[in-house]
Amino acid sequence: MTSALHFTPNDEANALLATEPLALLIGFALDQQVPVQTAFTGPLKIKQRVGTLDAHMLATTDLEPAFREKPAVHRFPGTMAKRVQELAAVVDEDYGGHAERVWTDAKDGADLRKRIADLPGFGEMKIKALGAVLAKRFDVELAQDLVPNHPTLGDVDSAQALEEYQSKKRAHKAEMRAKRQA
């Protein structure tokens, strides 16, 4: 078990991601069309602005004002506020408000995959990335089957490792764009 992840330059945000399972899920939900650092600082901003990361409270609160407050939580505040609210509702209704039950109550790797896939905003890439973080940073044995062969956030164990991961990811995206244009 880790005491902090290294997805942001903010120690408080990193500690929150490691100690509050809903923060981790929210960070992954926000991780699209913004830098990793922005996405994973989002849960701390939400907690500071709303006062809690309680799933029931987030599911029943209009989060858009908190998302729009400067600096915005995400570049698409309305859409992502709704996504986080939907995610919190699933955690509240299906897991009794305990986000960690997504993985602690899973019967096997296939069940864990389904549980993650059923979360709002979680497609195949996020299933693998969250699986890698759960397996490599939180020692969740059932998540081993979800770990892809390529580097993911699960491999990030320091600020330098995050920088290297992002550099490789940018190079890979550029290579893919070049192939599409050829």
What does each model-identified segment do?
Residues M1-A15, T19, K107-D118, E124-A182:
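C-terminal accessory module of base-excision DNA glycosylases/AP lyases that mediates lesion recognition
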Residues E12-A23, Q33-Q37, H74-T79:
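Structural motif
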Residues L25-A29:
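Short, aromatic/basic-rich helix-turn unit that serves as a nucleic-acid recognition element
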Residues Q32-T41, V91-G97, F138-L142:
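Short helix-capping/linker segments at secondary-structure and domain boundaries
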Residues T38-T41, L53, L58, T79, ...:
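Alpha-helix N-cap and coil->helix boundary residues
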Residues I46-D118:
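Alpha-helical ds-nucleic-acid-binding substructure associated with the helix-hairpin-helix region
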